[in-house]
């Protein structure tokens, strides 16, 4: 009893971000400075392509989307991942809600998507989940699933993103995504350590990427058009 099995340790090494594994299993305290995703890992996952700041299309076709909906001065960001975990779509914009709903529907079509439904995102998600038509095609809207972020659930999703980056399981273009990832830092609170963007900085792309990675790694049944 109380003895860790090698298989359990190896599984933890696979499932946990490097700094969390080191703290829990190797008695190495978390450093006070540094990037939780790892600057060298971010660089290793960055595609050799032009910078992407707003609308960008890669070569692949999305099989999973993550949408972070704008709040106040933030941006709505959508990121689509192809079957290899490479970002193949980036949409970053500020539109009125009705136009946002239209853009999200047309970009996502019948591909499975996670949507941040926290706060103002709730009524937008409800609209996205309603059937809609594009010409002769009717989409059911069932491919959109909402995620309500709490501090703990958001941290868990960021840790999943950190694992994907540190394992080089995903790739993304330079620009808005890498800029946000590189500015993330450890935030220490009375309830523990969290990943966060500095005060006043945007984290919309990181939120969207974390949602897309979660959907890509845990795909549901795909809903189609009729």
Predicted regions and their residues:
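Short, flexible loop/turn elements at secondary-structure junctions
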Residues: 29, 69-71, 117-119
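A residue-level signal for conserved active-site and pocket-lining positions in enzyme catalytic cores
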Residues: 25, 161, 208
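Mg2+-dependent endonuclease catalytic cores in nucleic-acid-processing enzymes, primarily RNase H-like
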Residues: 79-191
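Acidic two-metal-ion nuclease catalytic site recognized across multiple nuclease folds
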Residues: 91, 209-226
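Short, flexible loop/turn motifs enriched in small residues
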Residues: 60, 71-77
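ATPase catalytic-site recognition across NTP-hydrolyzing enzymes
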Residues: 1-67
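Structured core elements
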Residues: 65-68, 77-80, 114, 207-210
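Short, solvent-exposed helix-loop connector elements
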Residues: 189-201
